[in-house]
């Protein structure tokens, strides 16, 4: 339950693209807003205080409110797999990475250098504050890979090995928004390698 003194913000449900029959939808949306208000207030407090130049704040989350049909449209299904990752700090710029898919495995590779920690992190992804190389290595290419056998690049999302399942997901899809066979081949190999790694680690 939200605090009794919390001032709820009016909701324009005409903007909601999913189903609206669930009784918990509106309470979830208010909780979502409340959590963001608290985080925003905390960040503003730090940024206006004496520690602003020596403090790094990172936040991520997984908001279940997305499960209320908001991804019923094929072009919005990537929201099933999308969570926020926000970093506040002096003079931080993410450049071209802002439009590229990333995953939780990229977080520590991004945060450690900012904290002065050098060296590779186990099973790390890429540093999201550096530009993507012209030829990124397949293990750390700017794509998302999910245990369900789905993959996502900057243009769209698809089921591995199924070109017909490709759906454009970018807010402003480029004219070249189409299935990329090379991305699919690399991610099928990466999926198999990660599956093998997990099974070996668990001695299955």
Task: Please state what every model-predicted region is.
Residues 1-204:
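Solvent-exposed soluble domains appended to multi-pass membrane proteins
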């Amino acid at each position: 339950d939200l605090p009794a003194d919390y001032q709820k913000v009016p909701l324009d449900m005409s903007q909601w693209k999913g189903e609206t029959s669930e009784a918990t939808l509106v309470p979830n949306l208010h909780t979502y807003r409340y959590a963001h208000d608290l985080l925003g207030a905390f960040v503003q407090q730090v940024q206006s205080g004496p520690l602003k130049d020596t403090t790094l704040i990172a936040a991520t989350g997984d908001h279940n409110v997305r499960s209320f049909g908001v991804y019923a449209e094929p072009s919005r299904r990537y929201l099933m797999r999308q969570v926020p990752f926000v970093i506040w700090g002096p003079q931080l710029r993410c450049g071209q990475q802002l439009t590229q898919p990333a995953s939780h495995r990229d977080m520590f590779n991004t945060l450690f250098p900012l904290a002065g920690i050098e060296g590779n992190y186990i099973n790390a992804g890429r540093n999201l504050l550096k530009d993507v190389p012209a030829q990124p290595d397949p293990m750390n290419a700017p794509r998302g890979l999910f245990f369900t056998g789905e993959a996502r690049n900057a243009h769209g999302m698809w089921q591995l090995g199924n070109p017909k399942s490709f759906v454009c997901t970018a807010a402003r899809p480029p004219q070249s928004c189409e299935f990329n066979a090379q991305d699919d081949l690399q991610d099928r190999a990466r999926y198999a390698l990660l599956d093998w790694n997990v099974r070996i680690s668990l001695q299955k």
